[in-house]
């Protein structure tokens, strides 16, 4: 270490150790650093009491204490350090004499006579903890009493390199002007202790201002984390505040000046008229030419340069796949879209509340009066960035497009011309009914057609001529909702329903004597049974009320051919006969337990097969060859075995409201018409779900019917005023499904009060069908 000339003039020996120690203790900078004396207990970890001798020798016991006091190695280290403090200290002072003492020995005689106080040094010389020269400067009395720095600075040397203090025992000065001593370093042992027990806030760095380990607080660590994440350091700070419209934010109502407009703004300008006349006069005189012909240049003067003249076409790389193009924008992306593309408040709120992944569109259509009023697109940068990501991150695959005819993918259906005969034209119109015609039925012989309507009449017409041959009024208040011929040919019986009454009619004026007598015998056979009388209970309780009351309607009706009257508990809407003609079922949708009733003609007996029916009954149908009974509610169709009296199957058409059903003559297929405009085909052997769903009508379907004469035809009637004729081929092979082909749409009925075709029925042998409309007419289609 080099010593300047002023330091060579020191005339004394090394300064007393006691004074140096007192100054260090007075500064209070070594609190917690120095070790305890040997007389104190080893378990005491308090750093407040320090030993002066340890200060002189520069050794520290606390630096070598370990948290595990019971270990043998830690105990040996402590003993060795104490031996160094006691015995080794004197030897170290003898062997390692400070350099300033050797330099100053020869100068004692020269400086003894000098008594000038100005030449006395302002420091004392001693040794530090490592045996090196240590200069202890006197305290500096600060002149000022305040500090103008923002942060509290431990070291106040300023912005200078700390290498200037490498030759000094201190590293700077604190706020009071006192020296900040260089802390002692226990290099190996401190590193071991730090690796064992890492203090809170430890960074492993050294503070260049103080020389001590640099520890960071939780707040400082949080600031560093935010900086590394490119986040705002201060909580609650908004780097992008909303712009406050100071000048245009407030809309003024009153004008700045309310002075009336001057007259000169409403009359032509005379000065402008003079200027225009000068220009017109110059044009007329030829001095001004409105159109100046371009000068003709020779071909040699026109020189054109082809920049790509020497350019050679470069073929694309074999693995090059061009980027897919973006789809063109639609009407909703226009700055002035049509009104139907603009969302309302509810749609806008739903769009804002939905997640970005769930939104159908990435933007909300907005309307602007002019293109200059369109602001900047907010998500333009984001869209370009995502497009760039898609271009270089998404893999591209070259797919060979297959040129396939779409019609080849459709099932091969037969040509409708090959499926004839089926009805195509209207052959006859039956007029004479007042109000709506609600029901229609063709007799088993195919000669007569029966109909009923809102006027309460049952009318019978000739099928070929359309002439009305018989009628009878059943009710003055109720409409005739259902008519159905008995399906056998030996007797001609017509069942009609009006309100809560069901009438069995024999139109004897239209029948031969033999058919008339057989028809009367069928109806009179049940009078011998006392089925209409209430039954008496065995225990003497009150007799049970019969669900149906069979009686004669009266002489007036009997003269017209109405022979039997059945009274039930609720209005009847549907009548369907069993194939043998001895039973028929009625459906009353308003009834609960009496909604479905089965009537026996030969016994004049009415039975209620269901004590409790799930849902509201809509219609019922007998199986054409088995003892199975189908009951349709609004949403389901249940099939019951009447012989075993058990439920066979539940069909789930998936419709909201079933209107009508019909069973195929083979018995394995059912068609269902619904009020939600669908026609459903059910295969009973396939599934309880529909095999086919046909949507060809714009309004509700009222009735569906299969042809019962062996032709593969079925039809439906809708409120849109049309009938759909279909070809339905069913084979006995279970491996082949039914073939359904739409054939013809028949239009002719007018729609009245949103009601079109109410009912239809097929001819028993021919491909003819009869339809009943809300316009008060019947139509024959062949």
Curated annotation (Swiss-Prot):
PROSITE patterns: WD_REPEATS_1 (PS00678), WD_REPEATS_2 (PS50082), WD_REPEATS_REGION (PS50294). Residues 39-51, 59-75, 106-117 have a biased composition (Acidic residues). Residues 82-92 have a biased composition (Polar residues). Gene3D superfamilies: YVTN repeat-like/Quinoprotein amine dehydrogenase. It comes from the Eukaryota. GO terms for cellular component: nucleoplasm; PeBoW complex; preribosome, large subunit precursor. Residues 1-11 have a biased composition (Basic residues). Component of the NOP7 complex, which is required for maturation of the 25S and 5.8S ribosomal RNAs and formation of the 60S ribosome. Component of the NOP7 complex, composed of ERB1, NOP7 and YTM1. The complex is held together by ERB1, which interacts with NOP7 via its N-terminal domain and with YTM1 via a high-affinity interaction between the seven-bladed beta-propeller domains of the 2 proteins. The NOP7 complex associates with the 66S pre-ribosome. This is Ribosome biogenesis protein ERB1. It comes from Phaeosphaeria nodorum (strain SN15 / ATCC MYA-4574 / FGSC 10173) (Glume blotch fungus). The lineage of its organism: Eukaryota, Fungi, Dikarya, Ascomycota, Pezizomycotina.
């Amino acid at each position: 270490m080099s010593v300047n000339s002023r330091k060579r003039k020191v005339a004394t020996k090394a300064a007393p150790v006691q004074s140096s120690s007192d100054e260090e203790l007075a500064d209070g900078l070594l609190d917690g650093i120095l070790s305890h004396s040997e007389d104190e207990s080893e378990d005491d970890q308090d750093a407040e009491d320090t030993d002066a001798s340890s200060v002189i020798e520069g050794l520290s016991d606390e630096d070598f204490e370990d948290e595990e006091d019971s270990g043998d190695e830690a105990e040996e280290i402590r003993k060795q350090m104490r031996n160094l403090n006691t015995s080794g200290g004197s030897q170290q002072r003898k062997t390692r004499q400070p350099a300033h003492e050797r330099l100053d020995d020869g100068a004692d005689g020269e400086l003894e006579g000098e008594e000038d106080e100005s030449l006395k040094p302002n420091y004392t010389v001693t040794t530090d903890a490592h045996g090196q020269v240590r200069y202890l400067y006197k305290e500096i009395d600060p002149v000022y009493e305040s500090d103008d720095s923002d942060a509290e600075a431990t070291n106040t040397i300023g912005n200078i390199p700390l290498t200037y203090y490498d030759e000094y025992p201190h590293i700077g000065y604190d706020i009071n002007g006192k020296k900040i001593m260089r802390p002692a370093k226990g290099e190996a042992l401190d590193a071991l202790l730090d690796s064992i027990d890492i203090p809170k806030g430890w960074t492993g760095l050294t503070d260049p201002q103080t020389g001590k380990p640099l520890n960071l607080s939780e707040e400082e660590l949080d600031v560093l984390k935010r900086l590394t994440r490119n986040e705002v350091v201060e909580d609650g700070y908004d780097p992008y505040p909303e712009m406050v419209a100071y000048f245009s934010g407030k809309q003024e109502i009153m004008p700045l000046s309310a002075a009336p407009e001057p007259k000169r703004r409403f009359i032509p300008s005379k000065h402008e008229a003079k200027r225009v006349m000068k220009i017109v006069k110059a044009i007329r005189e030829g001095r001004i030419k409105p159109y100046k012909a371009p000068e003709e240049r020779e071909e040699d003067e026109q020189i054109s340069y082809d920049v790509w003249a020497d350019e050679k076409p470069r073929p694309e790389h074999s693995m090059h796949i061009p980027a897919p193009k973006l789809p063109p924008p639609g009407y909703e992306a226009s700055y002035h879209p049509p009104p139907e593309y603009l969302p309302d408040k509810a749609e806008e709120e739903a769009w804002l509340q939905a997640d970005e992944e769930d939104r159908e569109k990435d933007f909300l259509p907005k309307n602007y009066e002019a293109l200059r009023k369109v602001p900047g697109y907010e998500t333009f940068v984001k869209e370009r960035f995502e497009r760039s990501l898609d271009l270089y991150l998404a893999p591209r695959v070259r797919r060979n497009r297959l040129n396939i005819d779409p019609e080849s993918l459709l099932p091969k259906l037969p040509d409708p011309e090959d499926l004839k005969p089926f009805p195509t034209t209207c052959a006859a119109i039956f007029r004479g009914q007042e109000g709506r015609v609600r029901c229609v039925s063709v007799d088993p012989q195919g000669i007569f057609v029966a109909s009923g309507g809102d006027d309460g009449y049952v009318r019978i017409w000739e099928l070929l001529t359309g002439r009305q041959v018989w009628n009878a009024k059943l009710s003055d208040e109720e409409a005739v909702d259902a008519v159905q011929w008995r399906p056998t040919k030996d007797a001609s019986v017509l069942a009609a329903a009006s309100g809560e009454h069901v009438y069995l009619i024999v139109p004897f004026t239209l029948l031969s004597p033999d058919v008339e007598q057989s028809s009367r015998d069928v109806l009179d056979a049940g009078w011998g049974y006392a089925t209409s009388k209430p039954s008496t209970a065995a225990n003497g309780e009150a007799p049970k009320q019969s669900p149906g009351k069979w009686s004669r309607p009266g002489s007036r009706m009997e003269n017209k051919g109405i022979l039997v009257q059945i009274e039930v508990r609720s209005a009847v809407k549907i009548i369907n006969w069993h194939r043998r003609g001895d039973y028929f079922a009625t459906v009353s949708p308003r009834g609960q337990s009496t909604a479905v009733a089965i009537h026996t003609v030969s016994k004049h007996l009415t039975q209620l097969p269901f004590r409790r029916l799930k849902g509201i009954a809509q219609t019922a149908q007998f199986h054409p060859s088995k003892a199975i009974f189908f009951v349709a509610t609004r949403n389901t169709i249940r099939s019951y075995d009447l012989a075993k009296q058990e439920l066979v199957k539940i069909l789930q058409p998936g419709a909201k409201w079933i209107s009508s059903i019909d069973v195929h003559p083979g018995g394995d297929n059912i068609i269902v018409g619904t009020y939600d405009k669908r026609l459903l085909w059910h295969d009973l052997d396939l599934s309880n779900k529909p095999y086919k769903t046909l949507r060809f009508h714009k309004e509700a379907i009222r009735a569906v019917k299969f042809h019962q004469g062996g032709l593969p035809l079925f039809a439906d009637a809708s409120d849109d005023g049309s009938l759909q004729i279909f070809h339905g081929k069913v084979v006995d092979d279970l491996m082949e499904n039914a073939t359904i082909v739409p054939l013809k749409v028949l239009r002719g009925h007018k729609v009245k009060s949103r009601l079109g075709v109410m009912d239809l029925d097929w001819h028993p042998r021919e491909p003819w069908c009869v339809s009943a409309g809300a316009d008060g007419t019947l139509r024959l289609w062949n």
